[in-house]
Amino acid sequence: ASVLENLIYQKVYANDMIAHVVLICSAVNEIDYSAHEMLERVNQRLAEQGVSLNLSEVKGQVMDALRYSGLAKQLSGSIYLTQFDAFQHLRAISNK
């Protein structure tokens, strides 16, 4: 999880034009405590920078865990059914 976290920060801090980060979760089958904590940290730090954290293609049991923990409501961004939905919506709101 720390590798992903560091990569996100590196990319966001290197480009001040980034307004949204989307994590494609199609390969995620479960979320453990350390991954949950990492997502909370990333969400908070990105929000402090004015960058939204969004998730796409979240599987049912992972979505259940995010809802149960409250993280689904705490996200600075949204959870999208598909990556295409995320791209379309975020592009539309970025062009306003």
Task: Indicate residue ranges for each PLM-predicted region.
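Structured cytosolic domains appended to multi-pass membrane proteins
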Residues: 1-96
